[in-house]
Swiss-Prot record:
Belongs to the virgaviridae capsid protein family. This is Capsid protein. The lineage of its organism: Viruses, Riboviria, Orthornavirae, Kitrinoviricota, Alsuviricetes. It comes from Turnip vein-clearing virus (TVCV). Its main location: virion. The keyword Acetylation applies.
Length: 157
């Protein structure tokens, strides 16, 4: 018994592109309350989102028979998830130095504005993702999955 792969684009379903719905929703809610003043803080939350993803099927392991999973490569979720991941990486836009020299007032103001802009972008992307998940987009259950990738059983002998 296995999935009947008939097209190379079906291999994507076996990758680590699935998340449990409740942990994903909880992560969105938790992330909305986080502070993003340093790159380390942004990296931590980005890693928490990345850690939610796993592979749930293999060519010979069937999709779970109960519940749904979030498919982050879905047409609705993928652009939101990718934009969220990109919004966490602001290294090239926010200069964080540990030098003892005192920055000028304008340098401080510019850096503060960039941090604030990054925080707004992150929160905005999280809110968009949470909204789509709350509206039921991006989920897949076994029946929906197997409509795309049929499960074949061994012929009776």
């Amino acid at each position: 018994m296995s999935y009947n792969i008939t097209n190379p684009n079906q291999y994507q379903y076996f990758a680590a592109v699935w998340a449990e719905p409740i942990p994903m929703l909880n992560q969105c809610m938790s992330a909305l309350s986080q502070s993003y003043q340093t790159q380390a803080a942004r990296d931590t939350v980005r890693q928490q989102f990345s850690n939610l993803l796993s592979a749930v099927v293999t060519p010979s392991q069937r999709f779970p028979d109960t519940g749904s999973r979030v498919y982050v490569n879905s047409a609705v979720i993928k652009p939101l998830y990718e934009a969220l991941m990109k919004s966490f990486d602001t290294r090239n836009r926010i200069i964080e130095t540990e030098e003892e020299s005192r920055p000028s007032a304008s340098e401080v103001a510019n850096a503060t504005q960039r941090v604030d802009d990054a925080t707004v972008a992150i929160r905005s992307q999280i809110q968009l993702l949470l909204s789509e998940l709350s509206n039921g987009h991006g989920y897949m259950n076994r029946a929906e999955f197997e409509a795309l990738l049929p499960w074949t059983t061994a012929p009776a002998t």
